[in-house]
Regions:
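Bacterial N-terminal signal peptides that target proteins for export
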Residues: 1-8
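Bacterial N-terminal signal peptides
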Residues: 8-16
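Noncatalytic scaffold domains of N-terminal-nucleophile
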Residues: 20-40, 44, 48-209, 213-215, ...
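Active-site rim segments in enzyme catalytic domains, especially the processed small/beta chain
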Residues: 65-72, 80-82, 89, 232-233, ...
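Short beta-strand scaffold segments in enzyme catalytic cores
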Residues: 71, 75-83, 355-360, 417-419, ...
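Short, small/polar residue-rich loop motifs at catalytic or cofactor-binding pockets
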Residues: 244-245, 351-354, 413-415
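Internal maturation/activation junctions in enzymes
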Residues: 282-372, 386, 494-499
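Extended C-terminal subregions enriched in glycine
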Residues: 363, 409, 442, 451-501
């Protein structure tokens, strides 16, 4: 019998472990998000051994704290993600119309208690984490809880958005409590936002998971406040809310596969639009302005035909995309020039609402996540003791897109988190904020990067165009005008410059450097987006 010294075995084992270096397919992990504190939260989670799913959930909860006007735990969520060496999957956690909603009520206001649908963000984030994360939920939520409890200094974008809603904020007691300063006035630069009640709400979620939000004391406070003020949500509505598996749609673009989500996401329109782009002959920036804007307009005519499989298949058809592109090419006309350019200031239009973030890790997991309250500040309602704003779901904001609203329906919107792959490897993942501008922003950035081969950062800051039963609108503000060669198309009498931050969407993207197997990211130049890299 051979005797082996136990001490030798222990020492050998230690040496073996210390010499082992984990090999991963990619050299870094990354996050691109609308706020530096959210990107920082994702990086903290990476540093603790978390993956792209943990980082996405941490950053998403953080965004509900630091950008409360754009998204929140009272809102809705859509996610598309690719597991390392796995499938591309989707999560539908959008808001749902309560069972007691009265469909005959045609005169609903555009905000207030009667517009609030059943929230989905908390259920969606917890589902994403439970299925894919590696850290515990408490650890993942620590950054958001700390920021809510200790406070942070407001950035200019959030101050501007809150200031624009001052009259509506003053209409609701809970909202006044949380979103006016200590003097009862709008926040100004230098103000610190401390959210003790929101911190307590997040702590309960971190401890009890989905049940902590949809049942128990939080649910009771929500229902009591909403019911007492003319809203529809009941305890049963909250308890019965479930996350659904989204249908992933796939199309083709310039040799890449594009993946996004079916209803309640507008993924079919996103795919159709970029497939039309792909068939157009774009030789210069004049072509870009005229033809891309025409493609946007043609594609948007199909938004109302997404609610059955035959219509969706027709929308996704490459043959249909080629037909539309041919019509655009054949119907192009010369435009007269007008030196008296009309510049339109749309500061009074809701700008860039919603929040999108993208994460990727060294293992190859990729997450593209969009969450929202609807328009700026959603319903403008917050319940005392809870600390967060509710969504808008019923009423004119979303009503009429795909027919009559009825109990149990989920809110359809332009939200379209998107992933591009080649040979089953992610090459670009992105999404956008900005209502109807979301598919437009996603596709124009993707076209600039994947087909015109601009650097990702340039693709995000180049001017975007829009047209739908309107003149051609083109982005024109600080950060965009540096591309002076493009001034020629702003002289057309059919073009109006839009001088408003985030009007054309806020895109946050991650792409793969396929040679060095390294993730690179870029944040939209409008407002305070940032990228954080962890090696």
């Amino acid at each position: 019998m051979v005797n082996v010294n136990k001490s030798f075995i222990v020492i050998f084992s230690i040496l073996l472990v210390s010499c082992y270096t984990e090999e991963t397919p990619y050299s870094n992990s990354l996050i691109s998000s609308p706020h530096p504190l959210a990107s920082q939260a994702g990086n903290i989670i990476y540093s603790k051994g978390g993956n792209a799913f943990d980082a996405a959930v941490a950053a998403a909860f953080t965004l509900t704290v630091v950008e409360p006007s754009m998204s929140g735990i009272g809102g809705r969520l859509q996610v598309i993600y690719k597991q390392a060496d796995g499938d591309i999957l989707g999560i539908d956690a959008t808001t749902q119309i309560p069972e007691g909603f009265k469909t005959e009520d045609k005169e609903l206001p555009s905000y207030g208690y009667s517009t609030i649908g059943i929230p989905g963000v908390v259920a969606g984030l917890i589902k994403l984490h439970e299925d894919n994360g590696v850290l515990d939920l408490k650890t993942v939520m620590e950054p958001s809880i700390a920021l809510a409890e200790d406070g942070f200094y407001l950035y200019p974008g959030e101050i501007k958005r809150l200031q624009s809603e001052i009259e509506k904020i003053e209409s609701f007691e809970g909202t006044k409590l949380y979103f006016l300063n200590s003097e009862g006035k709008s926040f100004i630069p230098g103000d610190k936002l401390v959210q003790k009640d929101l911190a307590n709400t997040l702590k309960i979620i971190a401890k009890n998971g989905k049940k902590g939000f949809y049942e128990g004391e939080i649910a009771e406070k929500m229902v009591n406040d909403i019911q007492e003020n003319g809203g529809y949500i009941t305890k049963e509505d909250l308890k019965n809310y479930t996350v659904r598996k989204s249908e992933v749609l796939t199309g083709k673009f310039n040799g890449y596969d594009i993946h996004t989500l079916n209803l309640p996401s507008y993924g079919s329109i996103t795919i159709q639009m970029i497939q039309i782009f792909d068939q157009l002959k774009i030789n210069n920036e004049r072509d870009w302005t005229l033809k891309i804007s025409s493609a946007v307009e043609e594609s948007y005519k199909y938004r109302f035909f997404q609610n059955n499989i035959d219509s969706v298949n027709s929308i996704l058809s490459l043959t249909r995309a080629k037909q539309i592109a041919n019509n655009i090419e054949n119907n192009q006309t010369e435009v007269a020039f007008n030196s008296n350019l009309y510049e339109m200031d749309v500061a009074d239009i809701a700008q860039g609402h919603t929040a999108h973030l993208t994460t990727s890790d060294k293992y190859g997991n990729v997450v593209s996540l969009t969450q929202t309250l609807g328009p700026n500040m959603g319903s403008r309602v917050a319940t005392k003791g809870l600390g967060f704003l509710y969504n808008v779901t019923m009423g004119p904001y979303l009503g009429g897109y795909l027919g009559e609203e009825k109990p149990g329906d989920r809110a359809s919107s332009h939200i379209s988190p998107t992933i591009f792959t080649k040979n089953n490897e992610v090459v670009l993942a992105l999404g956008a904020a900005g209502g109807r501008m979301i598919p437009i922003a996603i596709n124009q950035v993707a076209y600039r990067y994947l087909k015109q081969k601009f650097p990702l950062s340039d693709a995000l800051i180049m001017p975007r165009v829009y047209k739908y039963e309107s003149p051609i609108y083109i982005e024109s503000h600080l950060g965009v005008n540096r591309f002076n060669d493009y001034e020629i198309y702003s002289e057309s009498q059919n073009v109006e410059r839009i001088r408003a931050e985030a009007y054309f969407g806020r895109v946050h993207a991650i792409a793969l450097d396929t040679i060095n197997k390294k993730w690179k990211g870029s944040a939209d130049p409008d407002w305070e987006g940032s990228v954080s890299d962890f090696k």
